């Protein structure tokens, strides 16, 4: 396994629309496993392939403390939403910033697993939030897009300033 490089806001590659995975093969399995390793290394609970500059519809999630509970969803699609919940979210691509974002408390998701099987899962609370957050990434959407224009502009200026200082980000929005 190898660690993947996470893209940081305001890198425009975070806005790329992910393409569906056509075939589950060893390359896709390696990408998913590398994403899991990267998620743990960065102490996250979810990661979308677009966050590591892979424009494919793959997300990995684990909201539990045991590493055996990894959830890999390929070509995920939310088919049902219910209820409302809003808690502070963070993002590996927007480090050290959290905001309370409105989400659905309960979702049903159709996807394909790493064995190529079609699956349907139900998620609520933190797992629901995490899956919605990662699926947003596949659509080129960031959690800060739900904030007011004023807050988004402040965040962008902050990260552009960090970019200039650390030269961490190379591509701007």
UniProtKB/Swiss-Prot annotation:
Cofactor: Fe(2+)
Family, similarity comment: Belongs to the polypeptide deformylase family.
Coiled-coil intervals: none
Known catalytic reactions: N-terminal N-formyl-L-methionyl-[peptide] + H2O = N-terminal L-methionyl-[peptide] + formate
SUPFAM superfamilies: Peptide deformylase
Domain of life: Bacteria
Record keywords: Hydrolase, Iron, Metal-binding, Protein biosynthesis
Gene3D superfamilies: Peptide deformylase
Name the record gives this protein: Peptide deformylase
Cofactor note: Binds 1 Fe(2+) ion.
GO BP field: co-translational protein modification; translation
InterPro entries with a match to the protein in the record: Peptide_deformylase (IPR023635), Peptide_deformylase_sf (IPR036821)
UniProt-annotated catalytic positions: 134
Function: Removes the formyl group from the N-terminal Met of newly synthesized proteins. Requires at least a dipeptide for an efficient rate of reaction. N-terminal L-methionine is a prerequisite for activity but the enzyme has broad specificity at other positions.
Annotated Fe cation binding sites: 91, 133, 137
